[in-house]
């Protein structure tokens, strides 16, 4: 009797194991890595003023008496809310860092910087993504 029970248990085991493995589904393929959005700067300018979100008096050279300048940026390609940064440099010295929200795939924004008459020289505004990648640099001169 003991041998018969052992034999039945063995038979059930050999029948069950192949059946169970035959019913096992293949593992799903690994998820495709999400391709990050690629931000681009579709428009950028240094200007003496802003009317709404439109730069006024855009140029690449300004008088030292200008008083205040605006760095305008139009961002394309954001598929979720993110940030861009404006880094204002005078003669390669960082003068200001400004974080600006980007809330849609096409977004216009700007920052401003007060310019003292003694700040003549070479300037640039670097536009960076949230993770610090340089998107565009806008050089300009204060005379």
PLM region spans:
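Bacterial N-terminal signal peptides
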Residues: 7-17
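Short, compositionally biased P/S/T/A/G/V-rich stretches that sit at domain boundaries
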Residues: 24-65
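Short edge beta-strand/loop segments characteristic of extracellular beta-sandwich folds
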Residues: 69-76
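Extracellular Ig-like/FN3 beta-sandwich strand-entry sites
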Residues: 81, 120-122
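Conserved aromatic beta-strand anchor motif in extracellular beta-sandwich/beta-rich domains
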Residues: 86-90, 127
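Short proline/glycine- and polar residue-rich coil/turn motifs
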Residues: 101-107
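Exposed aromatic-hydrophobic patches
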Residues: 107-115
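Short, exposed beta-strand-loop hairpins at the edges of beta-sheets
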Residues: 115-116, 124-140
């Amino acid at each position: 009797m003991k041998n018969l029970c052992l034999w039945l248990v063995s038979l059930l085991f050999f029948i069950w194991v192949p059946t169970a493995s035959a019913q096992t589904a293949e593992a799903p393929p690994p998820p495709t890595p999400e391709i990050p959005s690629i931000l681009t700067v579709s428009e950028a300018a240094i200007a003496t003023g802003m009317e709404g979100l439109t730069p006024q008096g855009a140029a690449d050279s300004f008088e030292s008496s200008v008083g205040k300048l605006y760095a305008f940026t139009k961002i394309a390609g954001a598929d979720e809310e993110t940030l861009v940064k404006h880094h204002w440099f005078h003669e390669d010295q960082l003068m200001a860092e400004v974080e600006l929200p980007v809330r849609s795939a096409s977004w216009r924004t700007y920052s401003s910087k007060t310019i003292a008459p003694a700040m003549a020289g070479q300037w640039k505004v670097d536009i960076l993504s949230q993770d610090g990648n340089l998107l565009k640099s806008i050089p300009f001169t204060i005379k």
